[in-house]
């Protein structure tokens, strides 16, 4: 089976992928599969050619078609550590068409600082040149992941070959796939696998090949080579990246 991966180098000043909670929202360390799929699907829609009765219908159909082509979606930090910090957000509602608009609400939310990350899209089969060109153009249209707070831009992107060779795991994997393996560290986080479009979608636990370190009172997260080896690998932007597919 010949597989290829589209790898995009994304740059953010900061981002926040909120966990399911109320008022105090912690952030995931890395963008979830649902955020990555949704961002690529948005790019495909912007390029046109999709029809439907509503934008939600078009988006849902586009995501379904995309998921049929993908076998893996993930992300990793690119030559940088990950740092969390709490920021108080005050969301104003100045545009409400009411004589007595509701008071603005405030909530505490974590933001993550990781200068650059790699978004990895692995396709089940080798795509045609036309399909590859469409995906490439769609990736370059990514300007945010998930919420509007996660504004970023694509620096560069490339297609790479997926090789069935062992290499240290560098990007997250569903925990149930590797739960019986000998795992040396890592961090477990619950993430959405697919955009929910208003429906209740259960979060899945994922293993992130990161370790926590401390400097004085602050915590930061770095990659680890000792979690375990992935069963596939790619080489992208001068990095050898182990995957578990």
Curated annotation (Swiss-Prot):
Protein name: CRISPR-associated protein Cas5
One annotated GO biological process: defense response to virus
UniProt entry keywords in alphabetical sequence: Antiviral defense
Source taxon at top rank: Archaea
UniProt KW Transport keyword: no
Function: CRISPR (clustered regularly interspaced short palindromic repeat) is an adaptive immune system that provides protection against mobile genetic elements (viruses, transposable elements and conjugative plasmids). CRISPR clusters contain spacers, sequences complementary to antecedent mobile elements, and target invading nucleic acids. CRISPR clusters are transcribed and processed into CRISPR RNA (crRNA).
Family the entry assigns: Belongs to the CRISPR-associated protein Cas5 family. Subtype I-A/Apern subfamily.
Pfam family membership, one: Cas_Cas5d
Record's keyword annotation contains Ion transport: no
Matches recorded under InterPro entries: CRISPR-assoc_prot_Cas5, CRISPR-assoc_prot_Cas5_N, CRISPR-assoc_prot_Cas5a-typ, CRISPR_Cas5_sf
């Amino acid at each position: 089976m010949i597989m290829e991966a589209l790898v995009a180098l994304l740059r953010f000043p900061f981002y926040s992928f909120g966990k399911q909670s109320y008022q105090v929202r912690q952030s995931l360390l890395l963008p979830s599969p649902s955020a990555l799929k949704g961002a690529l699907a948005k790019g495909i829609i912007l390029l046109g050619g999709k029809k439907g009765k509503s934008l939600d219908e078009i988006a849902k159909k586009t995501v379904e078609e995309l998921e049929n082509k993908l076998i893996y979606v993930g992300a990793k930090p690119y030559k940088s550590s990950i740092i969390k910090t709490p920021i108080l957000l005050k969301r104003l509602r100045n545009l409400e068409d009411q004589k007595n608009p509701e008071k603005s609400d405030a909530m505490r939310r974590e933001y993550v600082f990781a200068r650059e990350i790699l978004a990895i899209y692995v396709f089940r089969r080798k795509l045609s040149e036309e399909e590859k060109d469409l995906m490439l153009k769609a990736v370059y249209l990514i300007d945010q992941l998930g919420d509007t707070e996660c504004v970023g831009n694509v620096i560069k992107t490339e297609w790479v070959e997926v090789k069935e060779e062992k290499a240290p795991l560098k990007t997250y994997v569903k925990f149930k796939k590797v739960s019986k393996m000998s795992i040396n560290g890592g961090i477990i986080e619950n993430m959405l696998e697919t955009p929910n479009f208003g429906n209740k979608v259960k979060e899945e636990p994922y293993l992130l090949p990161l370790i926590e370190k401390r400097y004085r009172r602050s915590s930061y997260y770095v990659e680890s080579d000792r979690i375990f080896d992935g069963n596939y690998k790619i080489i992208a932007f001068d990095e050898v990246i182990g995957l578990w597919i």
